[in-house]
Amino acid sequence: EISLGLVGSEMCIRDSYSTFSLWDTYRAAHPLYTLLVPERAGDMVESMIAHKEAKGFLPIWTLWGKENYCMIGNHAVPVIVDAYLKGLITSDPERAYAAIKESLTLSQLNSDWEVYDKYGYYPFDIIEKESVSRTLESAYDDYCAALMAQALGKEEDYRFFMKRAGYYQNLFDKQTGMMRGKDSTGSWRVPFNMFSLSHASSHGGCLLYTSPSPRDR
């Protein structure tokens, strides 16, 4: 359990959760939790925020209470935003949003935001592994952050994150109709095989990542 301090004259205690396999669970499991067990979903979100305040960043893929960076994206963000938009974060949404904004703007081992913002994507000659997947999934996290910023009336932040949410378009190759790796000069990766399970993607190929590409609309 974690203590959230005094609420009125009573100490507020909530269940604490860890070992968030967020790359695997943010799409379906966590949205389902908000419908079936909303009180637990709220506690999970609180645990993610507490993790950020203790470690500096929202959890990515934790094990035994520690971040191991084995997966990509910052998918605590869509989980928190989904919970907020469903009314499960009522006590301090500004605290939740601050955790999101800092995690998406302060670089850490798994996310080099300076490179991301300089090029508008992750170039494969700088970010050697999973550059396509990292770009697409980061753009989706940015879109979710934009939704919360808009809901909180933070228009400047909304515009910032919506611009980033469009970065996925920079890796769309019109000639092949596929998402495709691009280097820091803007050149497409060659050779290119849409069916290849290459280093450009995480647990899939460019064909897999093109059809359900996270959108900014």
Q: Model-predicted segments: where are they?
A:
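Alpha-helical support elements that line or immediately flank enzyme active sites
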Residues: 18, 24-41, 81-87, 143-152, ...
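Short, charged/polar micro-motifs that form catalytic or ligand-binding hotspots
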Residues: 15-19, 30-35, 66-70, 131-135
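Short, solvent-exposed loop/turn and secondary-structure capping segments
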Residues: 31-34, 42-45, 59-60, 176
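Short, small-residue-biased leader/transition segments that mark boundaries at the very start
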Residues: 1-13, 212-216
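A conserved hydrophobic secondary-structure block that centers on an alpha-helix together
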Residues: 18-19, 38-42, 47, 51, ...
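Catalytic cores of carbohydrate-active enzymes
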Residues: 59, 146, 150-211, 215
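Active-site cavity-forming subdomains of large catalytic enzyme subunits
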Residues: 47-155, 160-168, 202-204
